[in-house]
From Swiss-Prot:
This is Ubiquitin carboxyl-terminal hydrolase 2. It is found in: Cytoplasm; Cytoplasm, Perinuclear region. The active site is at 28 (nucleophile), 309 (proton acceptor). InterPro entries: Papain-like_cys_pep_sf, Peptidase_C19_UCH, Ub_carboxyl-term_hydrolase, USP_CS, USP_dom. The gene is USP2. It comes from the Eukaryota. Gene3D superfamilies: Cysteine proteinases (3.90.70.10). It catalyses: Thiol-dependent hydrolysis of ester, thioester, amide, peptide and isopeptide bonds formed by the C-terminal Gly of ubiquitin (a 76-residue protein attached to proteins as an intracellular targeting signal).
Length: 357
């Protein structure tokens, strides 16, 4: 009789990256963003493989302390036991040195925190050690494609890091004079896009609705009239945004909070967003073969402007499984629960092949 085969041992390898972050006192906004960045595969690898060490820029304001503490924290999140939780207190010390607005234990806005953090990390691993003087030469005589390339080159002569490689795209702004028809264009780098949420009387609001509202042609009239450089006068104009260069990582900010001076309020509209195959070609400023994105992380805000709580839903770059990160508590979740009316920041990764310049 043939010998019985020994059962194949189940893999004992633990999927790492499922470690929680302790709440130091209203620091859930920080924990949510840190977990989203920890699951950004290329940024994670940059920290885990110590690639950042060769890029550290000692000319930076913080002398590389912020990047070093961030990398240390990412390494802890990926080497600790899934049942453990890590204290981000050393990291918090450095981020509040870099951005004093985060001193103390008040609740903060996660999108603002992300902006400050990425800016700080970028500065400390900027490959440009000595920035050239800003070039004031006008590029208005050039065709748009060439103008955008030149503007991007000028940007990279001053800002060039592994962080900006991942997160920075280029936005095109077109201003058309209704008197003479002249169209002026500007090309600006962006780290994220803040999307208005449309008010609908019926039917669900989708992420594409938000993007279409963001890129919709706006009329600038009355006090908003700009000066047309051809008419040499303030004229009624139309303004439109489009995406010139798609970033590797696209962060979409759903504008849930009003900026009213007297009393802030929050929109709890459910926005339906795709988990994969978000095709953004219709928002490209030039013909584009590929601009398809897949979701891998969401920063959520529950509650009101007066009292709320941040969590993160992240898809592991190793197992492709979704987990909920609620400060020190990490639990598996179904992908069908990722969409909710608490979604605030959406992290998408560009699927290959890339259409970037």
């Amino acid at each position: 009789m043939a010998a019985r085969m020994a059962p194949t041992p189940r893999s004992s390898k633990v999927v790492q990256g499922l470690t929680g972050l302790r709440n130091l006192g209203n620091t859930c906004f920080m924990n949510s963003i840190l977990q989203c960045l920890s699951n950004t595969k290329e940024l994670r690898d940059y920290c885990l493989q110590n690639q950042y060490l060769r890029d550290l820029n000692n000319n930076s304001r913080m002398r590389t302390a912020l990047m070093s503490e961030f990398a240390k924290l990412i390494q802890l999140l990926w080497t600790s036991s899934p049942n453990d939780s890590v204290s981000p207190s050393e990291f918090k010390t450095q981020i509040q040195r870099y951005a004093p607005r985060f001193v103390g234990y008040n609740q903060q806005d996660a999108q603002e925190f992300l902006r400050f953090l990425l800016d700080g990390l970028h500065g400390e691993v900027n490959r440009v050690l000595v920035r050239p003087r800003a070039n004031a030469d006008t590029l208005d005589h050039l065709p748009d494609d060439e103008k955008s390339r030149q503007m991007w080159r000028r940007y990279q002569e001053r800002e060039d890091s592994r962080v900006s490689d991942l997160f920075v795209g280029q936005l095109k702004s077109s201003l058309t004079c209704s008197e003479c028809g002249y169209c002026s264009t500007a090309f600006d780098p962006f780290w994220d896009l803040s999307l208005p949420i449309p008010k609908k009387g019926y039917g669900e609001v989708t992420l594409m609705d938000c993007l279409r509202l963001f890129t919709k042609e706006d009329v600038l009239d009355g006090d908003e009239k700009p000066t047309c450089c051809r008419c040499k006068a303030r004229t009624r104009c139309t303004k439109k945004f489009s995406i010139q260069k798609f970033p590797k990582i696209l962060v979409l900010h759903l504008k849930r909070f009003s900026e009213a001076r007297i009393r802030a309020s929050k929109l709890t509209t459910f926005v339906n967003f795709p988990l994969k195959d978000l095709d953004l070609r219709e928002f490209a400023s030039q013909s584009c073969n590929h601009a398809v994105y897949n979701l891998y992380a969401v920063s959520n805000h529950s509650g009101t402007t007066m009292g709320g709580h941040y969590t993160a839903y992240c898809k592991s770059p190793i197992s492709s499984e979704w987990h909920s990160f609620n400060d020190s508590r990490v639990t598996p979740m179904s992908s069908s629960h990722v969409r909710s009316s608490d979604a605030y920041l959406l992290f998408y990764e560009l699927a290959s092949p890339s259409s970037r310049m």
